[in-house]
């Protein structure tokens, strides 16, 4: 054991890596986490042309590398988005509507309007800032969140139907999209722990109303500085005044996670910039929806003006 710790110290492995080793993250492998071609690229052109999510081009980097933060994609400067078209707030973030019937092909929500606004905005980055998205779409007519469960029914409840007893506390969905969503969300929770503490609203897991917010949209902005350090910044769509999740502001010196098992360090919130609605020449309510997201991105990346 002493020899093992001695070898670890000589290699200067970070404390966060030791935590990952202890939790088994480095050694674990979910079926979807190490797959390439899972996330899709969302560009300004795709938003303007209202390209359907299923037709967006796929990125060949694995979920694991993208979640850890990698310079192999766009030199480490990208925004990772994970959503589900089952919760009203996330539908609004994608489409600007709370209606499940509205498809992401319109991209009229906070995400799409901001993607259009940041085109060429961060000129200090040679390749700019790119957006990657993975979106859960329930193939069933009644669309439930992947973490939604059936109500808890006591086995000795004489008034309950047997089917309700059999389904008690079971997951409502086990389709491919739901399984993939749960794996990705759980992996992000495990890697970044405290930065995504309130991602799942446990009080709504057993809700019987379709569209109830069970999870939040996950938005992680990765940035590489001139020391080849990549840091992870978390956006909270429900809290415009405190968009970045708490965490260390000391990024890891990691040239893109090439062979590294250390995820990008969560970064502390930076001061927000404010902009007037008239600055963008679009409808006031649309700008008001996206301005918080733009402020968040400006706190991570250097704006053009």
From Swiss-Prot:
Lipid attachment locations (N-palmitoyl cysteine): 30
Predominant location category: membrane
Keyword field: Cell membrane, Lipoprotein, Membrane, Palmitate, Signal
GO cellular component labels: plasma membrane
Keyword Ion transport appears in the UniProt entry: no
InterPro entries listed in its UniProt record: DUF6856
Protein name according to UniProt: Uncharacterized lipoprotein MG348 homolog
Organism: Mycoplasma pneumoniae (strain ATCC 29342 / M129 / Subtype 1) (Mycoplasmoides pneumoniae)
């Amino acid at each position: 054991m002493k020899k093992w710790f001695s070898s670890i110290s000589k290699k200067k492995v970070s404390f966060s890596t030791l935590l990952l080793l202890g939790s088994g993250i480095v050694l674990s492998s979910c079926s979807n986490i190490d797959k390439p071609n899972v996330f899709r690229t969302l560009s300004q052109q795709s938003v303007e042309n209202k390209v359907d999510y299923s037709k967006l081009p796929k990125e060949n980097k694995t979920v694991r590398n993208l979640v850890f933060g990698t310079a192999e994609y766009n030199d480490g400067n990208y925004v990772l988005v994970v959503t589900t078209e089952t919760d009203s707030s996330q539908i609004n973030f994608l489409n600007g509507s709370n209606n499940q019937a509205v498809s992401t092909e319109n991209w009229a929500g906070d995400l799409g309007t901001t993607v259009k606004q940041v085109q060429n905005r961060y000129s200090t980055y040679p390749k700019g800032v790119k957006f990657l998205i993975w979106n859960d779409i329930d193939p069933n007519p009644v669309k439930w969140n992947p973490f939604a469960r059936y109500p808890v029914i006591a086995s000795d409840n004489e008034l309950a139907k047997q089917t309700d007893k059999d389904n008690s506390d079971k997951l409502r969905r086990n389709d491919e999209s739901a399984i993939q969503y749960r794996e990705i969300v759980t992996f992000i929770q495990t890697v970044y722990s405290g930065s995504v503490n309130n991602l799942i609203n446990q009080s709504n897991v057993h809700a019987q109303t379709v569209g109830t917010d069970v999870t939040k949209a996950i938005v992680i902005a990765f940035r590489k500085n001139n020391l080849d350090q990549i840091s992870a910044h978390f956006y909270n769509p429900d809290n415009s005044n405190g968009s970045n999740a708490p965490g260390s502001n000391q990024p890891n010196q990691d040239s893109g996670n090439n062979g590294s098992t250390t995820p990008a360090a969560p970064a502390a919130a930076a001061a927000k910039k404010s902009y007037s609605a008239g600055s963008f020449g679009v409808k006031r309510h649309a700008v008001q929806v996206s301005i918080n997201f733009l402020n968040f991105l400006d706190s991570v990346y250097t704006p053009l003006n």
